[in-house]
Amino acid sequence: MSFKVNWNSLETEPLTNWTKELLTSALNSGKSPNILASNITIKDLNFGKIAPDFEILEIGELDRDRFRGIFKIDYQGDFHLTLHTKVQANPLNIYYHNSLEKEVCNYSQDEFITPNFLLSNEQFAIPLDLKLSDIKINGIGIIVFSKSKGLTLVFRNDPLDSIKVSSTFDTVQVLANFLQKQIENQIRDLFRETLPTLIHQLSLKYLSLDNNINEIKSKLSQQDSVSMTNNELASSLKLFDDEENEFPLIYSSKNLQKNMQLFKSRETFRLSVPKFKNIVQRTRLDKFTKSYPNLLNSLYANNADLQHRFVNNINHGHNNNSNTSSNGIPIELLVSHDDKQHYDKTDDLLKDISSIQANNFYKYSNKDAPNKPKRRRIKVHKKSKAKQDDNTVKASELQNVDSTFMDSRSISPQETIDTTSTLIESAPMTRNVSTNIKSPTLETMSTGSSSSASSQVIAHPTPKRAYQPADTTVSTTTINKENHIDYIKARNLYQDFIQMSQSPGYYDKVISNGGGIGLGNSGGNYFGFNGNGNGLERTMSASPIKHLNKDKKSINYIDTSKINEKLNQFRLDGGKNSANTNNSSGGKNFRPGFTRNESNGQQGILFEAFNFPSVAPPPPYC
């Protein structure tokens, strides 16, 4: 199998330039010999008019992604190549550098003392033009192609038959023969090692591009059901399949070189790192943040006095904790009361801040929108009328409470309070305790039967409360003695009152059951009056408590309204029974009235103790 190659298509400027760049990088790669004083450049490149003969001898494997074959190449054309460089003409300089490489190969040259001869260190460079022409190639090679591993080319024999080398030193026969031998050896190495390596790397570059295009196509086809229609998918695939597209999808060598330059510039410990456009480097991040527009910089632009004042404060150490790069302003400008640091344009400063914030708000929002930026407003030295009214009401209440106190005592830490009291506890520190018992008050009520007759009404007593009156000192023994006497008097009076009530059975029943007389007992109401008015015993519910403690009424609560109703009834019954005292004194249904002091001896003692002829005593709160 054989085929013809259109050799005239190679005579294009892009291909010629690309080949020059490729050969230049290949010739200058690695360490250059000491005889060369400069790099090698391509001066002239011409592929000629005669095409080589290319013949495939055998195909060992053929598939869509794999190929293996043996080919034969024969070329006897007019290809020529001209190289330009500079060579070192000073033999002492060449010998000096060669000896350094032999003696000091793995060490630094600065560690050894070398003779500093002026003649040997001087360079004498001579330009050299080297032309390669009349190339004859005849060889058999093996080609192995794979999409994953690229293209591999290996020659079985030495393909170079002959080559003509001409240079500027052709007049010197010794140099001409030397150059001829050296260049032939280098070209043989080129066909044996360099050319297969270059072809393999070039194939990997373009194969990776094809693989990337295939991956993009597959991803676009997978997104068809998600975010793209059929028309959009067809247009996107056409972008990659169209060979005549003005913007082909290829890797730009300039971008790759820029990225490589950026990468290599960071592999150094130098302090002077090169700058790049549109790139923020971490070493210069502080300068970038200072120049970035923020609130403080905007205020500096509008107020030159502010900038001068704040910079001076920083330089003199007045504002060491302030960070000029942060998006904020020094708090000393707003709250400082020092004459040296006080800023007298605070109102103007706040207006500038408000305008800057408003401009930023309208910059990133729709200007036609009616919404305005919401601001937080704080009114200083202004109190609401409701709070002032509450304060006046509380002050008046405190004054009224002070006027109603009957007794105040000061207790020291060593003093103790009788444990029989249920409303006052001992204090671990010095405090003032105010004892105030509100006795039952009398209210006159006009009745239809008698306008002059006045009725007494029982009011709910007020318990003791802790208060802070004027300091008065009372001894411990006096307090305990007075509390004990008051407690005995109140207990005797209360028991006498219960015995004289209309339901003595309740009292006897509570005593017989072992219950005590006091607030919260389950023996029933104190005065024998229930809500239904029948005088029966109140039963305690065994069901669990359904309400919280805050929803319950206190167990010390006494319904005084019902007591007043019974007292009025007693007065009416007492008035009727006063006319028939001798007849009804021995009857079974006789109910003693509170106005009859002669019916029971204990009753007179009860009323005289409270100085009220018809008022019931309070419970024992002491």
Curated annotation (Swiss-Prot):
Entry's Gene Ontology cellular component terms: ERMES complex
Amino acid composition bias (Low complexity), ranges on this chain: 446-455
GO biological-process terms attached to the record: mitochondrial genome maintenance; mitochondrion-endoplasmic reticulum membrane tethering; phospholipid transport
Amino acid composition bias (Polar residues), ranges on this chain: 577-587
Major localization class: mitochondrion
Limits of the SMP-LTD domain: 1-204
Family named by the database record: Belongs to the MDM34 family.
Protein name: Mitochondrial distribution and morphology protein 34
Natural source organism: Candida albicans (strain WO-1) (Yeast)
